[in-house]
Amino acid sequence: MEIRPGVEDDLDELTRIYNHYVIETPITFDVEPFTPDQRRPWLLAHPTSGPHRLLVAEEGGKLLGYATSSAFRPKPAYATSVETSVYLAPEHVGRGIGGLLYTSLFEVLAQEDVHTALAGIAMPNQASQRLHERFGFRQVGLLEQVGGKFDRFWDVAWFQKSL
């Protein structure tokens, strides 16, 4: 398995993976699937240098999942904070790929001017909670019933890690 930066040629598969979570789960609060063209600005917001990265796991020419570090908030004082996330192709969940992606992502971030990593997790999501805790995140807050999807409201737990 290879972990590498995401590139334009990955856009179709990245979109397919993300759309699974849009359509089937409350993990993301997007409610309508995207086209690759709609996801292109997101891809371009994750260059191969700097604090905002996109790493993909690939095996045998197939994308297994991806991890990102994105801008936490747009105001300048937040520049050294990133929001991290991991999305896996549903057929590859449970293989340890999320951990491999996060290991690589945090190695990259260690070389950047990043002070804090944050992750918002729609709850309940024990697998994501365990992954983040394994990487040194701790829960610092809970926003109750802030996302409406699938005819119910969902809480979001915020996890934080100093880098």
Where are these regions (language model features)?
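Conserved beta-strand-loop-alpha-helix junction that forms the acyl-donor binding cleft
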Residues: 93, 119-129
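Conserved acetyl-CoA-binding loop-helix of GNAT-fold acetyltransferases
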Residues: 94-107, 129-134
